[in-house]
């Protein structure tokens, strides 16, 4: 799985998950365009609260 993480100041959260890296990269661009105030990046692991 591939995850998109959002980091804003001290806060970190997983915002989406994808089965392919290609799909995740395409959506990563969309997230970065829609919200330039935060840092978005891809990760192979979700944050610890993602599954709850």
PLM region descriptions:
Residues 12-15, 25, 29-52:
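Short, mixed-charge low-complexity intrinsically disordered segments
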Residues 1-8:
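A short beta-strand micro-motif
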Residues 22:
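Acidic phosphotransfer microenvironment of two-component signaling modules
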């Amino acid at each position: 799985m591939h995850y998109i993480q959002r980091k804003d100041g001290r806060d970190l959260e997983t915002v989406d998950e994808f089965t392919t890296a290609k799909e995740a990269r395409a959506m990563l661009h969309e997230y970065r365009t829609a919200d330039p105030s935060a840092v978005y990046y891809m990760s192979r692991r979700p944050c610890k609260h993602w599954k709850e």
